[in-house]
């Protein structure tokens, strides 16, 4: 019995649904696979590309380009680190992978799966709290009489419901000047680095490019969500604005890993009033 050709459906989100059928033990099963085509451009040296186009000979004379699984054994890809501290670099990468594997992103304000700085509910949390409990909002800081101190500190009300820290009595408004000033201080010390080599990760930037400006608070390389490859963009947060400005003048236009860097502030600076 011939097997029917698979049915392919194009989805609006750019994916494809492949529908096939199979029969096992007298029962027919429908199999739906959802796939996404990802195009990855690999940059190699010119001589490597030329060797790949060489004509094959011997037993592989008429074989198509590329390795043949039946006659070629693939080895393990070995990364060469030309650095005296390569052991420390490998240990740091291992620790970072372990930390990222056990760490989940949770907003401190609403508890959803996104960063606190990107929370879409910053400006309305206080208004919702006031509408739900006008008496507590009017009373200001302090604990309600019906809530024991131990439960109030842990965010548990008398009814057993959990209250986020931003909605507890005495909590600061996320849209207040204090929160906004803290965010602006972070932006004032942050630079964006453009035209980065795709092979440059956070450890490479810290150890080979940014070491004259230590201590570095944070280094983030922007990556493609689908492939995990670098987009050639990174954000670096320094200890203060003066150190960030020194790094800006030193790194902008400098060559790094065969590319010319472009460095600027993460947000445009507002000129001081005359």
Curated annotation (Swiss-Prot):
Protein biosynthesis as UniProt keyword: yes
Subunit comment = Component of the eukaryotic translation initiation factor 3 (eIF-3) complex.
HAMAP family in alphabetical order? eIF3g
* Cell compartment(s), UniProt: Cytoplasm
Its job: RNA-binding component of the eukaryotic translation initiation factor 3 (eIF-3) complex, which is involved in protein synthesis of a specialized repertoire of mRNAs and, together with other initiation factors, stimulates binding of mRNA and methionyl-tRNAi to the 40S ribosome. The eIF-3 complex specifically targets and initiates translation of a subset of mRNAs involved in cell proliferation. This subunit can bind 18S rRNA.
Q: InterPro entries per the record?
A: eIF3_g, eIF3g_N, eIF3G_RRM, Nucleotide-bd_a/b_plait_sf, RBD_domain_sf, RRM_dom
**Disordered: where is this region?**
138-184
Cross-referenced SMART domains: RRM
Encoding gene, per UniProt annotation: TIF35
Name of a matching Pfam family: eIF3g
Q: Name one GO biological process term.
A: translational termination
A cellular component term, taken from the record's GO annotations: multi-eIF complex
Q: Which residues carry this modification: Phosphoserine?
A: 63, 129, 166
Recorded GO molecular functions are: RNA binding; translation initiation factor activity
Q: Which UniProt keywords apply?
A: Cytoplasm, Initiation factor, Phosphoprotein, Protein biosynthesis, RNA-binding
The record's family statement is: Belongs to the eIF-3 subunit G family.
Compositional bias per record (Low complexity), positions renumbered to this chain: 138-150
Task: Point to the regions of Basic and acidic residues compositional bias.
Answer: 170-184
| Protein name as catalogued | Eukaryotic translation initiation factor 3 subunit G
Organism listed in the record: Candida glabrata (strain ATCC 2001 / BCRC 20586 / JCM 3761 / NBRC 0622 / NRRL Y-65 / CBS 138)
Where is this protein primarily located?
A: cytoplasm
Which stretches make up the RRM domain? 189-268
PROSITE patterns, per the entry: RRM (PS50102)
């Amino acid at each position: 019995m011939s097997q029917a050709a698979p049915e392919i459906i194009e989805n609006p989100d750019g994916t494809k649904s492949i529908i096939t059928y199979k029969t096992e033990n007298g029962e027919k099963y429908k199999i739906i696979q959802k796939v996404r085509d990802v195009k990855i451009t690999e940059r190699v040296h010119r001589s490597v590309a030329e060797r790949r186009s060489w004509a094959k000979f011997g037993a592989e004379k008429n074989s198509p380009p590329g390795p043949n699984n039946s006659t070629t054994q693939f080895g393990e890809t070995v990364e060469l680190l030309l650095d005296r501290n390569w052991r420390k670099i490998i240990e740091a990468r291992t620790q970072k992978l372990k930390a990222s594997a056990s760490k989940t992103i949770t907003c401190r304000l609403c508890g959803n799966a996104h960063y606190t700085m990107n929370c879409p509910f910053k400006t309305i949390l206080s208004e919702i709290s006031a509408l739900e409990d006008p008496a507590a909002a009017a009373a200001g800081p302090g604990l309600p009489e019906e809530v024991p101190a131990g439960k109030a500190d842990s965010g548990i009300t008398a009814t057993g419901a959990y209250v986020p820290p931003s909605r507890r009595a005495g909590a600061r408004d996320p849209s207040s000047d204090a929160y906004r000033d803290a965010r602006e201080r972070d932006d004032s010390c942050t630079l964006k680095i453009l035209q980065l080599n795709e092979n440059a990760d956070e450890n490479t930037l810290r150890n080979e490019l940014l070491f004259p400006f230590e201590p570095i608070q944070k280094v983030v390389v922007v990556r493609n969500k689908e492939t995990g490859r670098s987009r050639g963009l990174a954000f670096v947060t320094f200890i203060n604005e003066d150190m960030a400005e020194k790094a800006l003048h030193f790194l902008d236009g400098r060559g790094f890993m065969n590319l010319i860097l472009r460095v600027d502030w993460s947000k445009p600076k507002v000129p001081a009033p005359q």
